[in-house]
C-alpha cells in the first residue's frame, strides 16, 4: 500500500532524517512536544512570506536550537540581524529555555516539495489557472534535475460546483522503493470558492547508503540446443 502511507514517515531512519532530534524522559516528554508544536506554529505564522521549507528542532542541555530552512534567508535575518534576534527572543519565551536560531538556505526551491506546493497555492490565490500552475511547477522541477514529480490538486477547481481532483506526473515516482529519496509535502490555497488542497511528490534519485551499485553485468547463460521438430512427410 505504498500509495496510502505517508512517504516521509515510512522513510524515517532509512533515507529521511527526523525534524526533531531530542530525547526526554516520561516527565518532560509532553512539555517538550508541546513546546515544539508552539514554536513551529509561531515560526510558520511569522515567516509566512519567507519561503519556509522545514524547521528542525534540537534540544541540547536545557536549551533549544532551531534550524530554519528557507529559500529567502535575507527575509528571515532582516536588516543587520534584527529580525532573527526578535525570533530568538520569542522562541526562548515560548520554549522557556535559552534559544539559538540557525538559518540554512535552500539552494534549489524548485526541487523542494514544500516550496513547490506553497508556490502553486499562492498562484491559485492570485487566480492563475490551476493547470498552468501545475505544469509550470512540473517543468521547472524536471529542468533542474528531478528524476520525477507528481502534483495533485483537489477542490472546487476553476470554481466548479462539484469538487474533483486532477494530477500531473512526469518521470517516475517509485513510492514502494524505500531507498528512493522522495520529498513529499502538502499545502492549501484559500480561494473565493473554498479551500483547494495541493500535494507534491518529488523523486530526486535513490540513496544506496554507501553500498556500491551493481555494475557488473550478469554472465549470459549458454543457450540450450533446441530440439528440432520433425516435419510431417
UniProtKB/Swiss-Prot annotation:
Lineage: Bacteria, Pseudomonadati, Pseudomonadota, Gammaproteobacteria, Vibrionales
The protein, known as: Small ribosomal subunit protein uS3
Record's keyword terms, sorted: Ribonucleoprotein, Ribosomal protein, RNA-binding, rRNA-binding
GO BP annotations, alphabetical order: translation
Stored InterPro entries: KH_dom, KH_dom-like_a/b, KH_dom_type_2, KH_sf_prok-type, Ribosomal_S3_C_sf, Ribosomal_uS3_bac-typ, Ribosomal_uS3_C, Ribosomal_uS3_CS
PANTHER family per UniProt: 30S/40S RIBOSOMAL PROTEIN S3 (PTHR11760), SMALL RIBOSOMAL SUBUNIT PROTEIN US3C (PTHR11760:SF19)
Domain KH type-2: residue ranges: 39-107
Subunit structure and binding partners: Part of the 30S ribosomal subunit. Forms a tight complex with proteins S10 and S14.
Protein family membership: Belongs to the universal ribosomal protein uS3 family.
SMART domains the UniProt entry points to: KH
Family matches, as HAMAP family: Ribosomal_uS3_B (MF_01309_B)
Known role: Binds the lower part of the 30S subunit head. Binds mRNA in the 70S ribosome, positioning it for translation.
A Pfam family of this chain: Ribosomal_S3_C
GO cellular component terms, A-Z: cytosolic small ribosomal subunit
GO MF entry, a single one: structural constituent of ribosome
Organism annotation: Vibrio vulnificus (strain YJ016)
UniProt key word Repressor: no
Amino acid at each position: 500500500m505504498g500509495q496510502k502511507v505517508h512517504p516521509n514517515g515510512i522513510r524515517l531512519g532509512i533515507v529521511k532524517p527526523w525534524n526533531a532530534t531530542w530525547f526526554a524522559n516520561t516527565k518532560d516528554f509532553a512539555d517538550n512536544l508541546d513546546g515544539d508544536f508552539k514554536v513551529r506554529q509561531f515560526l510558520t505564522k511569522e515567516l509566512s512570506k519567507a519561503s519556509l521549507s522545514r524547521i528542525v528542532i534540537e534540544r541540547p542541555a536545557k536549551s533549544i536550537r532551531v534550524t530554519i530552512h528557507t529559500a529567502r534567508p535575507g527575509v528571515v535575518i532582516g536588516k543587520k540581524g534584527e529580525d532573527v534576534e526578535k525570533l530568538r527572543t520569542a522562541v526562548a519565551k515560548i520554549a522557556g529555555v535559552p534559544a539559538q536560531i540557525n538559518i540554512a538556505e535552500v539552494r534549489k526551491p524548485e526541487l523542494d516539495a514544500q516550496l513547490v506546493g506553497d508556490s502553486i497555492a499562492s498562484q491559485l490565490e492570485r487566480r492563475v489557472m490551476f493547470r498552468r500552475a501545475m505544469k509550470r511547477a512540473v517543468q521547472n522541477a524536471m529542468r533542474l534535475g528531478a528524476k520525477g514529480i507528481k502534483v495533485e490538486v483537489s477542490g472546487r477547481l476553476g470554481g466548479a460546483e462539484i469538487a474533483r481532483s486532477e494530477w500531473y506526473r512526469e518521470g517516475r515516482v517509485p513510492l514502494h522503493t524505500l531507498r528512493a529519496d522522495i520529498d513529499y509535502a502538502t499545502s492549501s490555497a484559500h480561494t473565493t470558492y473554498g479551500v483547494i488542497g495541493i500535494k507534491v511528490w518529488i523523486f530526486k534519485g535513490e540513496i544506496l547508503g554507501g553500498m556500491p551499485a551493481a555494475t557488473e553485468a550478469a554472465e549470459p547463460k549458454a543457450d540450450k540446443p533446441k530440439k528440432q521438430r520433425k516435419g510431417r512427410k
